[in-house]
Curated annotation (Swiss-Prot):
<feature type="topological domain" description="Cytoplasmic">
    <location>
        <begin position="290"/>
        <end position="307"/>
    </location>
</feature>
<dbReference type="InterPro" id="IPR017452">
    <property type="entry name" value="GPCR_Rhodpsn_7TM"/>
</dbReference>
<dbReference type="InterPro" id="IPR050427">
    <property type="entry name" value="Olfactory_Receptors"/>
</dbReference>
<feature type="glycosylation site" description="N-linked (GlcNAc...) asparagine">
    <location>
        <position position="5"/>
    </location>
</feature>
<keyword id="KW-0807">Transducer</keyword>
<comment type="function">
    <text>Odorant receptor.</text>
</comment>
<feature type="topological domain" description="Extracellular">
    <location>
        <begin position="80"/>
        <end position="100"/>
    </location>
</feature>
<feature type="transmembrane region" description="Helical; Name=5">
    <location>
        <begin position="196"/>
        <end position="219"/>
    </location>
</feature>
<dbReference type="Pfam" id="PF13853">
    <property type="entry name" value="7tm_4"/>
</dbReference>
<keyword id="KW-0297">G-protein coupled receptor</keyword>
<feature type="disulfide bond">
    <location>
        <begin position="97"/>
        <end position="189"/>
    </location>
</feature>
<dbReference type="GO" id="GO:0004930">
    <property type="term" value="F:G protein-coupled receptor activity"/>
</dbReference>
<feature type="transmembrane region" description="Helical; Name=1">
    <location>
        <begin position="26"/>
        <end position="49"/>
    </location>
</feature>
<keyword id="KW-0552">Olfaction</keyword>
<feature type="topological domain" description="Cytoplasmic">
    <location>
        <begin position="220"/>
        <end position="235"/>
    </location>
</feature>
<protein>
    <recommendedName>
        <fullName>Olfactory receptor 4N2</fullName>
    </recommendedName>
</protein>
<keyword id="KW-0472">Membrane</keyword>
C-alpha cells in the first residue's frame, strides 16, 4: 500500500508567481529582456577569457567558470516559467520536478562553493602574494573546481534522496513557479519533521556557514590592505567589494529560504524569483563591470569579431 501511495502523484500543478495577468505580463517582458541582453553577455565573458592569452590568472579561470555556472543555472527555472506564463494550466511531471530540484541544488551548491574558492584565491593573492604562484598553480585550480562540482553533486543528491523517500498521495498543487524543497516537502502525506531538519542542515546550515566564512575572510583581506599603496589598495578594494556584493546577493535569499522552517511567507516568491532568475543572469556582469582587464579584453574581442 505504501508503494502505491508513492506513485499516486505523477504530476504537480504549479500555481505560478501570481494570478494577476498584468504582473505576469510585466515579469514575462522583464525576464525576456534579461535573457536576450544579459545571457549572451555571460557567454561573451566565457569566450573572452578563453580566447585572451592575457587572462590566464586563476581569478579569470574562476570567473569564466562562474559565468558558465550562472548561465546553466538560469536555464533551470526561467525558460519553463516563461512558457508557463502563456499556459492556462501549469503542470510539471513528478520526474520533471525532481530533475529540476536536482539541478537547482547541484549548480547552486557548486556556485556557493566556487565563491568560497574565489575568496581563498583573493586571500592568497593579497595576504600571501609571494606564495600565490605556488599555491594557486593550475593543478590546484583544477582540483578545486573538481571538488566544488563534487560538493554540489553530493549536496543535491542528499536533497533528492530525502524527497524520493517521501510518499505523495495528494494534494498536488505547488504554490510557486518552480519545484523546490520547501514547497514539495509540504505535499508529502507523512510527518516530515525529521526530513525538514536534515534538509535545513544540508542546505541552510551550509549556506549560513559559507556566508559567515566568506564575510570573515574578506574582513581579514580588507584589514590587510589598509596599509598598501594607493593603486594596489584601490584595485584590491574594488575586487573585494565586488565579491562582497555578489555574496550578499547570492547567500541572502538562500539564507532566507533554507535556514527557517518550511512555512509559506508572503515574500517567498519574490525572493525565489531574484534567487533563481535575476541574480544568475546579473552575477558575472557585476564582476565584469568592476574588472578593467576583462572589460578591455571584451572590447577587443567585440571589435575583432563583431564590429
Amino acid at each position: 500500500m505504501e508503494s502505491e501511495n508513492r506513485t499516486v502523484i505523477r504530476e504537480f500543478i504549479l500555481l505560478g508567481l501570481t494570478q494577476s495577468q498584468d504582473i505576469q505580463l510585466l515579469v514575462f517582458v522583464l525576464v525576456l529582456i534579461f535573457y536576450f541582453i544579459i545571457l549572451p553577455g555571460n557567454f561573451l565573458i566565457i569566450f573572452t577569457i578563453k580566447s585572451d592569452p592575457g587572462l590566464t590568472a586563476p581569478l579569470y579561470f574562476f570567473l569564466g567558470n562562474l559565468a558558465f555556472l550562472d548561465a546553466s543555472y538560469s536555464f533551470i527555472v526561467a525558460p519553463r516559467m516563461l512558457v508557463d506564463f502563456l499556459s492556462a494550466k501549469k503542470i510539471i511531471s513528478y520526474r520533471g520536478c525532481i530533475t529540476q530540484l536536482f539541478f537547482l541544488h547541484f549548480l547552486g551548491g557548486g556556485e556557493g562553493l566556487l565563491l568560497v574558492v574565489m575568496a581563498f584565491d583573493r586571500y592568497i593573492a593579497i595576504c600571501r602574494p609571494l606564495h600565490y604562484p605556488t599555491v594557486m598553480n593550475p593543478r590546484t585550480c583544477y582540483a578545486m573546481m573538481l571538488a566544488l562540482w563534487l560538493g554540489g553533486f553530493v549536496h543535491s543528491i542528499i536533497q533528492v534522496v530525502l524527497i524520493l523517500r517521501l510518499p505523495f498521495c495528494g494534494p498536488n498543487q505547488l504554490d510557486n513557479f518552480f519545484c523546490d524543497v520547501p514547497q514539495v516537502i509540504k505535499l508529502a502525506c507523512t510527518d516530515t519533521f525529521v526530513v525538514e531538519l536534515l534538509m535545513v542542515f544540508n542546505s541552510g546550515l551550509m549556506t549560513l556557514l559559507c556566508f559567515l566564512g566568506l564575510l570573515a575572510s574578506y574582513a581579514v583581506i580588507l584589514c590587510r590592505i589598509r596599509g598598501s599603496s594607493s593603486e594596489a589598495k584601490n584595485k584590491a578594494m574594488s575586487t573585494c567589494i565586488t565579491h562582497i556584493i555578489v555574496i550578499f546577493f547570492m547567500f541572502g535569499p538562500g539564507i532566507f529560504i533554507y535556514t527557517r522552517p518550511f512555512r509559506a511567507f508572503p515574500a517567498d516568491k519574490v525572493v525565489s524569483l531574484f534567487h533563481t532568475v535575476i541574480f544568475p543572469l546579473l552575477n558575472p556582469v557585476i564582476y565584469t563591470l568592476r574588472n578593467q582587464e576583462v572589460k578591455a579584453s571584451m572590447k577587443k574581442v567585440f571589435n575583432k569579431h563583431i564590429a
